[in-house]
Structures are given as structure tokens and as C-alpha cells.
Regions:
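Post-HExxH zinc-binding segment in Zn-dependent metallohydrolases
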Residues: 287-328
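Secondary-structure capping and boundary motifs in well-ordered enzyme cores
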Residues: 42, 102-105, 132, 173, ...
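C-terminal, non-catalytic "cap/extension" segments appended to globular domains
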Residues: 2-6, 25, 38, 42, ...
């Protein structure tokens, strides 16, 4: 077979696998949104069958031979083809390390765990979820040892979400954040507090939904390729390619800001996914490169833009139109209220200053669980202890504590540090962007076009072509540093809390 034919086979293989991904992601999305409660067993069965097919395709001798032939002829491959081969071989070697029956059983476990978690959260019943979560952590430890026996299991999974990330890197990063953020929190606590009482009230879900679509359109999302639904925990997913994007939110009638910022956050993810260059359609490059870069985009739009003085002032007339109780609220009052700093229980509703401490709690617990230092049954106790130590709050129940996030139920062990890293990436990207375009002026006009064009050119269009560190360095012209993020927090919040 000629090399051009081999390259064509590579594209066909990726296209076929993207169709399997579409089917499996659709089943998962359905389960977290509109699927009836009694369908978990059926969905688990379907995912098990599809997972077996996917496993056999990826680990089959024909696929392995194809990839090894291409890998041995790297000199004649394009940059894109080399990256496709690298990513596929990495995935295949991971799968080859895990016995097929265990891989399939894990896919079934996650479907059931997500279903049980949703009920457990609603009923404040951690005990019913604990056996599933124990099995998820045990399986992740086992799989990590299969795939990288010379690595600590947690280091392996951290690196799967963010290339090169380790506990050592995380420890250094979080230590730097705490060094400057803890004094900032003390400064804020000693200052006059901000009134945010008007953010609570009666905000009909229908009006909040109208606001959601307004925000998605305002941010530049193509609604022909991006849908909105509701779920217990907001999330974003691509169904097989960047042509089919789904985001979800969770409405609370007494709090419009919760869903408003969830929608802005998830829309940031969706802009990244749908912004990948069309030439990568149905290939492994048709996705964001890492969860850290993904969170840099979601938290960039949610906080750096969405909580800015300029954006808040622009969107206020729309809020007053939808919610009459806000008719006397000024732009300055709303800006201060939206940025109120107050230690709380819920990560997704945390302010920008204390947010990284929520992530740190999860990181510390994952580290201990993956090292076998604590048991899942002890998790609520350790969770509540760290929340008291880091945020000074007494967690009243598990629904507002250890059960609040869906990530562990979905098997996403090692994901959480990406949120804090993404926030820091985003601040550095904003510094670079603001040196080239007038971001504040654009936001004051509600015009995201130049902002999106910059992100598309520097981040989105590249998909998974580059490693995350390479992508950042190309976009920034320098290596990553957390300094811009901490400087941003200090400047912004010392102006609000004088």
C-alpha cells in the first residue's frame, strides 16, 4: 500500500471513531439531561456494547500496524499527521494496557454512578453513592498502574487532563496562590462589605432561559450548532465533532446570577470547541487540547469578561427588562454585587478570590484518595474539615458539600486543578490580548467579535495540534506564569474593597 493510501486510511479510521464518540457522548448527554430515571441500565448496556466495539477497533492488529507504519515514516508526514499519529498511539497504548472486560465494566460503572449521584445529591444521601465512588477511585488507581507503573497514580491522571501536570507542579502553583490570596482575603474581610441582597428574589425560569439565549447570542455562539438544556450540574460536551455542541445550566428561581454565569462559563467552553478549524473535522485534532486550556476559555468569559465593569454595565438594561425588581439597581452596584467576596460552600458559585481554595480542597482530597491515605467513606469528614480550615465555613450537609460536583461520579479524577490553572492561563491571555485590542471598549459595546477573533486565531482554531504548553507559548510569546492572575485579583478587589 502506498503511503498516501495509508494516510487516507488514517483519516477514515478517525472518522469512524468520531461516529462512535458521537453515539456514546449522545447517550451520556441524554442521561444527564432528559433521560427518564429508569433508563440507566439500558444506557449502560448500550455504552458497554459501543465501548467494546471502540476498544476492538483501537487495539486491533490492523489499526496498530497502520499507526506503527506511519510512526516509522514520520519524516514524510505533515505536522498535523504527526500529531494525529502521536495522539492515537497514546490512546491505543493506554487501551492495550487495560484488559477489555475491565474497560467495559468501568464504562457501565460510570453510567450507573452518575445516576446514583444525582439522586444522592437531591436526597443528601452520601452513603448510597459511596460504594460507586469507592469503585471509581479504586479502578482509576488500578488503571493508572496498568498504564504507567512507574508513576504515582494521581500523577498519571493529572497528566491525562493537562500534559506534564504533576503533584509537584500543582503543589508549587497552589502554594504561590495561597501566599498572596490569603492576605487578600484578610484585607477584604477587614473592609466594608458589599450589598448583594438584590441578587436574591423571584426570577422566573422562563425569563432566565430568555437571558441564557440572549447571552449565548451576544457572545457569538452559533445556535445552529450549539444547544442548551438543563441538568443537575452545568456542563458542556461535543457530540462527535465541533459541529454539534451542547451546553447545560441549572436554574434557581431565587438567584438569576447563578445560571447567568453558568451559561457564560459553559458558552466559553462551547466557543472553544466550535472554533476549531473545519479542516480538522472528524479527526483527533477536532477538540480542545487540554482541560486547563478549556477552563482558560470558560473562566475567561465567565470572570475576566463577564464580571468586568464594562460588561456588567452593558448587560444591565437587559436584566432590568427581564427582572423588574432590578429597576433601581445601578451599574456600579451590580458590578460590586456580582464581585462580592464571601467564603461559601458551592464551588460553581464562588467568587473569583476564594475560588481557588475550593479547587485546592478537591485537589488535596484527590491526592489522599489516590494514595490510599483516606477512604471514600471518610470523605465527608475530611471535606468538611478542609472547608473549615481553608474557607472558614461549616458545611451544613453533604448536598452542599462533598456531593455538589458531578466530576467524580463521571470518573474525572485529576480534573479539578485544571480550573485553577485555567483561571491563571486566562489572565495571562487577557494581558496579551489587551495589548493588541481595546477589550474594555469592546465589552462596553457588547461586541465580542474582536475578542473572539483573537481567541480563534491564537487558541481555538488549532484544536489539539499543539501541546498545551506549546499553544500557550505561541499565543503569549512567553512561558506561563501565575503572576498576571494574582496581580489581576489584587488590583480588581482592592479597588472594590478599599
Amino acid at each position: 500500500m502506498e503511503l498516501n493510501q495509508v494516510k487516507e486510511q488514517l483519516l477514515k479510521l478517525q472518522s469512524r471513531l468520531s461516529a462512535y464518540a458521537h453515539a456514546m457522548e449522545s447517550i451520556s448527554y441524554d442521561g444527564q439531561t432528559v433521560a427518564p430515571k429508569g433508563t440507566a441500565e439500558n444506557r449502560a448496556h448500550a455504552l458497554a456494547v459501543l465501548s467494546e466495539e471502540e476498544y476492538l477497533i483501537k487495539t486491533g492488529s490492523e489499526t496498530v500496524a497502520l499507526l506503527e507504519l506511519l510512526d516509522n515514516n514520520k519524516a514524510v508526514l505533515t505536522e498535523e499527521e504527526k500529531r494525529m499519529v502521536h495522539l492515537m498511539l497514546k490512546d491505543i497504548r493506554r487501551m492495550q494496557s487495560i484488559p477489555m472486560d475491565e474497560y467495559i465494566a468501568y464504562q457501565e460503572l460510570v453510567v450507573k454512578a452518575e445516576d446514583v449521584w444525582e439522586d444522592a445529591k437531591k436526597n443528601n444521601d452520601f452513603a448510597s453513592f459511596a460504594p460507586y465512588l469507592s469503585e471509581i477511585f479504586e479502578t482509576n488507581i488500578k488503571f493508572a498502574k496498568y498504564c504507567a507503573p512507574d508513576k504515582a497514580p494521581y500523577d498519571y491522571w493529572l497528566g491525562e487532563y493537562e500534559d506534564g501536570l504533576t503533584m509537584e507542579v500543582c503543589d508549587e502553583f497552589f502554594a504561590k496562590l495561597r501566599e498572596r490570596i490569603v492576605p487578600l482575603i484578610k484585607h477584604i474581610s477587614a473592609s466594608e462589605q458589599v450589598d448583594s441582597s438584590f441578587l436574591k428574589g423571584n426570577f422566573p425560569v422562563a425569563k432566565q432561559e430568555e437571558l441564557s439565549y440572549y447571552l449565548m447570542k451576544l457572545m457569538g455562539l452559533d445556535l445552529a450548532h450549539c444547544g442548551l438544556s438543563t441538568s443537575e450540574h452545568p456542563f458542556t460536551t461535543s457530540l462527535g465533532s465541533h459541529l454539534d455542541e451542547r451546553i447545560t445550566t441549572h436554574y434557581m428561581e431565587d438567584d438569576f446570577a447563578s445560571s447567568m454565569y453558568s451559561v457564560i462559563h459553559e458558552s466559553g467552553h462551547a466557543l472553544y470547541d466550535t472554533g476549531v478549524d473545519d479542516k480538522y473535522l472528524y479527526t483527533l485534532l477536532d477538540a480542545g487540547v487540554s482541560m486547563g486550556i478549556h477552563e482558560s476559555q470558560s473562566r475567561f468569559y465567565e470572570n475576566l469578561l463577564g464580571r468586568s465593569k464594562e460588561f456588567v454595565a452593558f448587560v444591565l438594561p437587559k436584566l432590568k427588562e427581564l427582572f423588574p425588581s432590578l429597576k433601581d439597581v445601578t451599574a456600579e452596584a451590580l458590578y460590586r454585587a456580582i464581585n462580592r467576596v464571601e467564603p461559601s460552600f458551592i464551588r460553581t458559585e464562588a467568587d473569583e478570590v476564594t475560588y481557588c481554595l475550593h479547587v485546592l480542597v478537591r485537589y488535596e482530597l484527590e491526592k489522599k484518595l489516590m494514595a490510599g491515605e483516606i477512604k471514600v467513606t471518610e470523605l465527608p469528614e475530611h471535606w468538611n474539615k478542609l472547608y473549615k480550615e481553608y474557607l472558614g465555613v461549616d458545611v451544613p450537609n453533604d448536598k452542599l458539600g462533598v456531593l455538589q460536583d458531578s466530576h467524580w461520579a463521571g470518573g474525572a479524577i485529576g480534573y479539578f486543578p485544571s480550573y485553577a490553572l485555567g483561571s491563571a492561563y486566562g489572565a495571562q491571555l487577557l494581558s496579551k490580548m489587551a495589548a493588541e485590542i481595546d477589550v474594555k471598549d469592546a465589552l462596553s459595546k457588547g461586541d465580542f467579535s474582536k475578542i473572539n477573533d483573537w481567541n480563534r486565531e491564537h487558541i481555538w482554531k488549532h484544536g489539539s495540534l499543539y501541546r498545551s504548553d506549546e499553544l500557550l507559548e505561541k499565543a503569549l510569546g512567553e512561558k506561563f506564569s501565575a503572576d498576571d492572575y494574582i496581580d489581576y485579583l489584587e488590583k480588581k478587589f482592592k479597588e472594590i474593597y478599599k
